[in-house]
């Protein structure tokens, strides 16, 4: 407490209510090839509908990772999903050579200032699906069908100087009179360019060309057609409220994103997004003081496109509102105000790409994940996940399935093939391997497909957590029933299960009347140990994670009897609770002078030894039936 130099009352407060907190144990993690969505970025997904909304529906080429993810989500948890793409994948663009923009961070670093030379727009994410997008924008010059579009010179005339002018008749409504400029060559009028399209015309305006000394020049005018998406908005874009206050005009635009080919919605021509009243001025604000600059609005809010370069006519777009009296208008003659995106390319991720995705899950301080699935990836990827995620974090389990060729249409050789797959993996208590693939219905492509079981095995751990606790075995008829499976590619017989289980592979078996069941709970640890069971490994993950989280609050306190007693009073009630919930048989916490010696204290360390007797799951049941003579006492038989 603070020293007081004169009489007074000092009020202070101490918080000694710390407890061991609950920790997450059901968060899944998977890296895969998806049809759409951000790449090389972790996205939390909590349902199959959410998975479709973010990563799109699967195709016949990339269904595997989607179906594995959806299989896991069916058990009621959420998953951290990472999409990866191959090096040749490209985002769709307006024009030029397509580029690869994996995610928001890469866009901001490489293309945030509009670089790219790909026209005004790029698809939000890599893939051919972006080729279905069309973007159209309109301002005062292109929105209505009452504006001036172009001139046709019917007579070039003669004797004109550079001072010649063209005068256009005013519109009937009096809204705004169009203006134009002349190009003179050899005294003749060679071109007439629209400088302002005007508005409110019901018929083509009359063009009067003056200052000729010879034959008079004449020209006819053509009105624009209506912007096809004008019905999506309530008003003609003119000048924003911010623009009026800043003293500029014609900064307002409307923009729509269209599903031109129906790849996103199933209906060609569907409007996916619309942005009303956005501004060409880089400093523009909306009514709630957020940026209303069209590039910022699109890049921050659109789910489908990035804004890259300005339109060709937008040479003054992006300037401050105070620097422009009137912003350039699009006009219907601008070729790039409505554009279909092209150049998007799908490329499946290579092994190195998938490994890079799993590496995002390796930092336990930034990412909380418990159940890492490897889908149908090769053993090199699965082993990488074990070595570089689970063995580094030591608070999650990697779930692996054998290769498809090992158990699908491999009659008679399944056991040897699956064991060969196992030989490529690190034998770790932080990993587990099942025996096969399931046959399930792919409703997105209307067909049945084989899918690896590792998503389901991770899902049975979720069931164990929800129905009981993480330290309960996920196997068996109570918690190990596989969902959404028509059949197994291979259901091992008893003799085959004996071989698999002895090697550390958990069989998944189809039992008539009982469904398809996970029939083993081993980890990949090769040596005899309590940690060669999933429930024991997950028990220690929970204990270590929860106690370590609570122990952080002892950092920078004094290593004295009070702190040690406080730590024991923190941990022991937690362990008694776990014991009451059948997770451990007994425990002891040692945190005193015996393990916090003077030398340990002088090294600024704090030590606690926590001894637990983990509960064991039943793997083998022996039932002995003994027949006796009628006159024999059971006590005589030792019963």
Language-model region placement:
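A short, compositionally biased
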Residues: 114-117, 160-164, 202-204, 244-254
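Ser/Thr/Gly-rich low-complexity blocks that favor extended beta-strand/coil architectures
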Residues: 122, 126-144, 166-182, 209-219, ...
């Amino acid at each position: 407490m603070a020293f007081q130099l004169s009489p007074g009352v000092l009020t202070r407060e101490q918080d000694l209510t710390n407890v061991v907190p609950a920790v997450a144990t059901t968060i899944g993690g998977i890296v895969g090839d998806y049809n759409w969505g951000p790449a090389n970025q972790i996205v939390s997904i909590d349902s199959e509908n959410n998975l479709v909304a973010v990563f799109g529906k699967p195709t016949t080429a990339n269904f595997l990772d989607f179906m594995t993810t959806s299989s896991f989500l069916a058990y009621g948890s959420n998953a951290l999903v990472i999409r990866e793409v191959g090096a040749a994948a490209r985002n769709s663009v307006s024009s030029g050579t397509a580029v690869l923009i994996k995610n928001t961070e890469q866009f901001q670093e490489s293309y945030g200032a509009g670089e790219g030379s790909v026209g005004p727009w790029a698809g939000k994410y890599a893939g051919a699906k972006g080729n279905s997008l069309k973007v159209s924008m309109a301002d005062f010059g292109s929105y209505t069908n009452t504006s001036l579009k172009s001139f046709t010179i019917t007579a070039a005339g003669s004797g004109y100087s550079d001072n010649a002018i063209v005068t256009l008749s005013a519109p009937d409504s009096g809204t705004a009179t169009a203006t134009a400029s002349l190009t003179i060559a050899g005294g003749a009028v060679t071109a007439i360019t629209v400088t302002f399209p005007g508005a409110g015309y019901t018929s083509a305006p009359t063009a009067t060309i003056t200052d000729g000394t010879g034959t008079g020049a004449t020209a006819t005018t053509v009105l624009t057609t209506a912007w096809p998406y004008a019905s999506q908005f309530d008003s003609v874009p003119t000048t924003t409220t911010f623009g009026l206050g800043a003293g500029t005009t014609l900064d307002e635009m409307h923009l729509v994103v269209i599903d031109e080919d129906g790849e996103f919605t199933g209906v060609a021509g569907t409007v996916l997004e619309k942005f009303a009243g956005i501004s060409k001025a880089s400093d523009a604000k909306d009514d709630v003081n957020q940026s209303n600059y069209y590039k910022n609005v699109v890049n921050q809010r659109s789910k489908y496109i990035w804004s890259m370069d300005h339109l060709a006519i937008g040479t003054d777009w992006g300037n401050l509102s105070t620097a422009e009296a009137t912003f350039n208008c699009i006009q219907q003659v601008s070729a790039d105000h409505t554009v279909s995106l092209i150049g998007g390319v799908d490329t499946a991720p290579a092994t190195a790409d998938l490994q890079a995705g799993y590496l995002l899950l390796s930092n336990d301080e930034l990412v909380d994940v418990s159940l890492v699935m490897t889908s149908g990836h090769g053993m090199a990827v699965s082993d990488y996940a074990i070595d570089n995620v689970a063995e580094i974090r030591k608070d999650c389990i990697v779930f692996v399935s054998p290769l498809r060729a090992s158990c699908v249409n491999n009659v008679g050789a399944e056991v040897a093939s699956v064991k060969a797959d196992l030989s490529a993996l690190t034998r770790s208590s932080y990993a587990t391997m099942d025996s096969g693939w399931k046959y399930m219905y792919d409703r997105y492509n209307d067909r049945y497909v084989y899918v690896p079981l590792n998503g389901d095995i991770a899902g049975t751990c979720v069931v164990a957590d929800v129905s009981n606790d993480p330290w309960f075995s996920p196997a068996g008829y109570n918690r190990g029933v596989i969902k959404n499976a028509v059949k197994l590619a291979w259901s091992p017989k008893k003799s085959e299960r004996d071989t698999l289980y002895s090697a550390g592979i958990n069989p998944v078996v189809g039992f008539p009347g009982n469904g398809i069941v996970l029939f083993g709970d081993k980890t990949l640890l090769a040596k005899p140990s309590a940690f060669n069971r999933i429930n024991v490994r997950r028990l220690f993950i929970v204990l270590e994670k929860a106690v370590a989280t609570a122990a952080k609050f002892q950092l920078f306190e004094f290593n004295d009897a009070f702190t040690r007693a406080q730590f024991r009073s923190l941990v022991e009630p937690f362990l008694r609770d776990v014991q009451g919930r059948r997770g451990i048989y007994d425990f002891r916490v040692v945190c005193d002078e015996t393990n916090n010696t003077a030398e340990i204290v002088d090294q600024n360390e704090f030590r606690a030894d926590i001894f637990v007797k983990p509960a064991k799951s039943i793997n083998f049941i022996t039932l002995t039936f003994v027949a006796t003579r009628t006159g024999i006492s059971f006590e005589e038989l030792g019963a």
